[in-house]
Amino acid sequence: MADSLSDRIQKFILENYLFTSDTRALGLDDSLLGRGIVDSTGMLEIIMFIEEQLGVTVKDEEMIPENLDSVSRIAAFVESKRKVA
């Protein structure tokens, strides 16, 4: 079965920031900034992942924690952008 959008996002963050494949290390609603998983540079890398791997353009005004601070928020943001496109 194909990975869900949330699975793909979680896998990217686990492998690139927590250096593990253990999904227990990152809950879907865990704050990426609050837990210190990513900093501003890491957030830019996540935005590049969203644009390059998920095919969604992130505008400057959309680069806010409400859209990007957890796996579930990123997935919801990407889904909302895909519906508009």
Task: Name the predicted role of every residue range.
Residues 2-39, 47, 52-53, 57-85:
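Phosphopantetheine-dependent thiolation modules in NRPS/PKS and related acyl-activating systems
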Residues 42:
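Two-component histidine kinase catalytic core, primarily the HATPase_c
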